[in-house]
Amino acid sequence: FIESGYDWDGGGVDIWNSFADAFASTANYLTSIDKNPWSFDTTWGREVLPPKNILDFYDSLKQNNPKGCSSVKSRSIPKKLSEWSKLGFTDINSNDLPNRDDLEARLIAPDGINGRMFIVYQNYKNILYYNCSSYYAVSIGLLSDEIIK
């Protein structure tokens, strides 16, 4: 993270005492991740409502031999966003998800099958590179949604 330091306020890079530098450095880090940098065309994810029959297929969504921290391992297998719609997932307001075949998404349920569920995209994984906690990544995502409003 130190290598991604960014001087936002003109006083030299100081991620410890300058909020501006700390936030700018974090953004710089997220946009410089080698494999899949931050995508400005896609959000982090969205809260979803599962179909009533989710218990019938929930276990089939789990990854085989996942690698990474527990938050990366707990994500579902990837599916196109349109496939999640076909399974019966909707947004939090019971509206259809966007019909996109070009967007790969995964399901997360940080509090288990009876808790809130989210469909997440690559930007969510990038947040996990910074801090590998589902609670942290979802909190950052939800906060960013509110800031955008």
Regions from the language model: what does each represent?
Residues 16, 20-83:
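Helix-loop elements that line ligand-binding/catalytic pockets
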Residues 1-39, 94, 98-99, 104-112:
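Alpha-helical segment that forms one wall of the substrate-binding/catalytic cleft
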Residues 58-149:
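C-terminal soluble interaction/assembly domains
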Residues 4, 9, 19, 41-43, ...:
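Surface-exposed loop/turn and secondary-structure junction residues enriched for glycine/proline
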